[in-house]
């Protein structure tokens, strides 16, 4: 029983929403990381930038409408957090700034982000509720299960919306095709009748 539970916890641990990335930022460029996030989700992140004298890196977190959710200049190491208001694609950008007179070199940037369930402090919850370690793991497992179910529900809803949009688009294309065909037939009929009258007027045909 315990082994089965540990296997389940391991599987759900692989599904955790903790994302870590490391990259090199070229001088005087910016790199943005984008991800779709559900509405009303807490997003927490931790970053660290290699120190290069005279070079500056700023970061900014925003949505597709350009609303700034978190921002800081001259970063080296720190944390940030924001809450998504609506379902949208949110991006975190790191911007390198090097003075014109200085020869810049690439800087290493590491970023770890958590969202939703993984932002909870289960150790603190366990201490406050006086839960055993196994009970804390079960609580984490329950929250992860609920989160995955909600994500699947949202995905299903989006799929239905996309299918409805696709069906409406197909109906409009079909209507436009029929309308275009009718217009072409009408134009062809008018042209035949016009040419017939023209040739009769010129006495080219009876």
Swiss-Prot record:
Location of the protein in the cell: Membrane
Range of residues in the leader sequence: 1-20
Keywords recorded for this protein, A-Z: Developmental protein, Membrane, Signal, Transmembrane, Transmembrane helix
Transmembrane segments: 173-193
BP terms from Gene Ontology: dorsal/ventral pattern formation; endoplasmic reticulum to Golgi vesicle-mediated transport
Coiled-coil ranges per UniProt: none
Cytoplasmic side: 194-206
Protein name stated in the entry: Transmembrane emp24 domain-containing protein bai
């Amino acid at each position: 029983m315990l082994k089965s539970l540990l296997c389940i916890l391991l599987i759900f641990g692989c599904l955790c929403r903790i994302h870590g990335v490391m990259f090199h930022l070229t001088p005087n460029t910016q790199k943005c990381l984008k991800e779709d996030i559900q509405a009303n989700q807490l997003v927490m992140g931790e970053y660290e930038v290699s120190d290069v004298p005279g070079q500056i890196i700023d970061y900014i977190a925003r949505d597709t409408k350009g609303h700034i959710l978190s921002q800081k200049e001259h970063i080296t190491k720190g944390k940030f957090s924001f809450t998504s208001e609506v379902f949208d694609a949110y991006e975190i950008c790191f911007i390198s700034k090097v003075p014109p007179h200085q020869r810049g070199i690439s800087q290493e940037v590491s970023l770890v982000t958590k969202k939703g369930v993984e932002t909870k402090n289960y150790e603190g919850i366990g201490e406050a509720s006086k839960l055993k370690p196994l009970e804390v793991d079960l609580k984490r497992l329950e929250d992860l299960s609920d989160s995955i179910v909600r994500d699947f529900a949202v995905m299903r809803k989006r799929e239905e919306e996309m299918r409805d949009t696709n069906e409406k688009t197909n109906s409009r294309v079909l209507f436009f095709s029929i309308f275009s065909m009718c217009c072409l037939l009408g134009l062809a009929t008018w042209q035949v009748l016009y040419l017939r009258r023209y040739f009769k007027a010129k006495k080219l045909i009876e």
